[in-house]
């Protein structure tokens, strides 16, 4: 079975059914409880997928319930995966490898600079994830 949205690429939707996928992927999702909090704890979710597949926009990762029930701000991020995120070509400065982790670092920096505008406390941030997301958390500590 060839996925017609990515001609010639087998299984691009295997773990992300009915999800629009694109190289234009560097986006964040932010869920804020209502009423807007002041100085709320921030929880940042990093999805897994063996660093090969995944997206933060799956319904199972919807942070609105956690934000509402726990009165926290929930942030999830996309980052480049597969060869686009983790291909390393030693000696080639244009492909140093692990750029997916750099994408994550940029998202973390964005949260630090901007989360106060959403009612979040940049000094009270918890990173969490599953599988490759959990490994990413350990790499950022």
Curated annotation (Swiss-Prot):
Residues annotated as signal peptide: none
One Pfam short name: COesterase
Subcellular location: Secreted
InterPro entries: AB_hydrolase_fold, AChE-related_enzymes, CarbesteraseB, Carboxylesterase_B_AS, Carboxylesterase_B_CS, Cholinesterase
Active site: 131
Catalytic activity: an acylcholine + H2O = a carboxylate + choline + H(+)
EC number from the UniProt entry: 3.1.1.8
Gene Ontology terms: cellular component: extracellular space; plasma membrane
Annotated substrate binding sites: 49-50
Domain of life: Eukaryota
GO molecular function, one term: acetylcholinesterase activity
Keywords carried by this UniProt record: Disulfide bond, Glycoprotein, Hydrolase, Phosphoprotein, Secreted, Serine esterase
GO annotation terms (biological process): acetylcholine catabolic process; choline metabolic process
Summary of the tissues where the protein is detected: Present in most cells except erythrocytes.
Chain positions found as Phosphoserine: 131
Quaternary state and interactors: Homotetramer; disulfide-linked. Dimer of dimers.
Biological role: Esterase with broad substrate specificity. Contributes to the inactivation of the neurotransmitter acetylcholine. Can degrade neurotoxic organophosphate esters.
Family: Belongs to the type-B carboxylesterase/lipase family.
Descriptive protein name: Cholinesterase
């Amino acid at each position: 079975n060839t996925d017609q949205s990515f001609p010639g690429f087998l299984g691009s939707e295997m773990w992300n059914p009915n999800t629009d996928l694109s190289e234009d992927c560097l986006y964040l999702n932010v869920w804020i409880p209502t009423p807007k909090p002041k100085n709320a704890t921030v929880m940042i979710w990093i999805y897994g997928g063996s660093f090969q597949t995944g997206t933060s926009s799956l319904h199972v990762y919807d942070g609105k319930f956690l934000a509402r029930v726990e009165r926290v701000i929930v942030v999830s991020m996309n980052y480049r995966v597969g060869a686009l995120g983790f291909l390393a070509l030693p000696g080639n400065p244009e492909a140093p490898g692990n750029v997916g982790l750099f994408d994550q670092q940029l998202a973390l920096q964005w949260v630090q600079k901007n989360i106060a505008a959403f009612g979040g406390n940049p000094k009270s941030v918890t990173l969490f994830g599953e599988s490759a997301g959990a490994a990413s958390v350990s790499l950022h500590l």
